[in-house]
Regions:
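Conserved donor-binding/catalytic core segment of Leloir-type glycosyltransferases
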Residues: 3-24, 30-33, 46
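A charged, aromatic-enriched C-terminal amphipathic alpha-helix characteristic of glycosyltransferases
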Residues: 154-193
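Short hydrophobic beta-strand element within catalytic cores of glycosyltransferases
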Residues: 116-119
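Nucleotide-activated donor-binding/catalytic signature segment of Leloir-type glycosyltransferases, i.e.
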Residues: 58-79
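Short alpha-helical segment that forms part of, or immediately flanks, the ligand-binding pocket
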Residues: 85, 107-112, 126-127
Length: 193
């Protein structure tokens, strides 16, 4: 069982829960952590890994270890699932900077555990977040990510807990579109842009 804390009692922590591989953009997370901690040194930036921290590009592992030695980030390795859930339940933001994802498990897990989520407004994420601009940042914009992060570290999103409901409906909308009964859900025309 995972015990959730009230949002105001949670650590000022930003979690990276994705694989530490190049397509997940770990460099953006590390750059963000360095820049944000200059202004807010009390904020913890934590990497969570189910095994030893590894990557398809060893540079990212080396750089993460260097930043951990500098006190910029924390590396949590060899976590069991409940250990990870306990970290999420005591954190304020799950941060993602992936170039691609569909419905990320990390999104649903964090949202269910009362942890805000912040993802790039890219590929499938706008649909996952129902175009909630408060939980998405302009891709590759450190400035936008930092300003959204500051807000999400201070208070829970009013949309907290709605991601799973929206995702369930996404499958129904996709089937409606494929069977010709979902024109109102299409997002490929000028009315959507």
């Amino acid at each position: 069982r995972v015990e959730q804390k009230l949002f105001v009692e949670r650590k000022q922590r930003v979690v990276f829960g994705a694989r530490w591989d190049q397509e997940k953009q770990p460099q953006f997370f590390m750059d963000l952590a360095q820049a944000y901690k200059q202004k807010h040194p009390e904020t913890e930036f934590a990497i969570c890994s189910g095994g030893p921290l590894r990557s398809n590009n060893e540079y990212y592992v080396d750089e993460a270890k260097h930043l951990a030695n500098e006190g910029i980030i924390t590396i949590n390795e060899n976590l069991q699932k409940n250990d990870y859930y306990n970290i999420l339940a005591d954190s304020r933001v799950l941060f993602n900077c992936a170039l691609q994802d569909w419905t990320s498990n990390t999104v649903s897990e964090a949202d269910a555990l009362g942890c805000n989520v912040l993802f790039p407004a890219y590929r499938s994420f706008p649909e996952v977040f129902s175009n909630d601009h408060t939980r998405m940042y302009v891709p590759w914009s450190q400035q936008d990510a930092m300003s959204k992060l500051e807000i999400l570290l201070s208070k829970p999103s009013p949309s907290m807990g709605q991601i799973s409901d929206w995702t369930d409906s996404t499958i129904d909308r996709m089937i409606d579109i494929m069977t010709g009964k979902g024109e109102q859900w299409r997002r490929d025309g000028p009315h959507y842009r």
